[in-house]
């Protein structure tokens, strides 16, 4: 039986724009074989939507709690959604 897939929306706030955060997300998501996207939000946060197995998404979440060297993560929220299957790769959206 195949492992169940999930969709998660992760919102990270703090000093997370202009510090390479989206590229950090991209690199880690690809390493974890996740699909979805990450993008800057107008309020200064970074939104990530990821699909994959739960342990993969949780591993990404744990990496995003720390972030890249010049980031200052103040808060991170995760919201679990139903798997959509709409993504075939992981990308940075503008």
Predicted regions and their residues:
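Intrinsically disordered, low-complexity, mixed-charge
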Residues: 1-94
């Amino acid at each position: 039986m195949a492992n169940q897939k999930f969709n998660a929306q992760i919102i990270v706030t703090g000093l997370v724009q202009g510090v390479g955060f989206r590229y950090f997300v991209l690199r880690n998501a690809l390493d974890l074989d996740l699909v979805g996207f990450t993008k800057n939000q107008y309020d200064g946060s970074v939104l990530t939507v990821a699909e994959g197995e739960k342990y993969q998404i949780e591993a990404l979440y744990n990496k995003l709690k720390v972030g890249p060297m010049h980031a200052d993560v103040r808060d991170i929220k995760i919201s679990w959604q139903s798997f959509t299957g709409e993504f075939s790769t992981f990308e940075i959206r503008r």
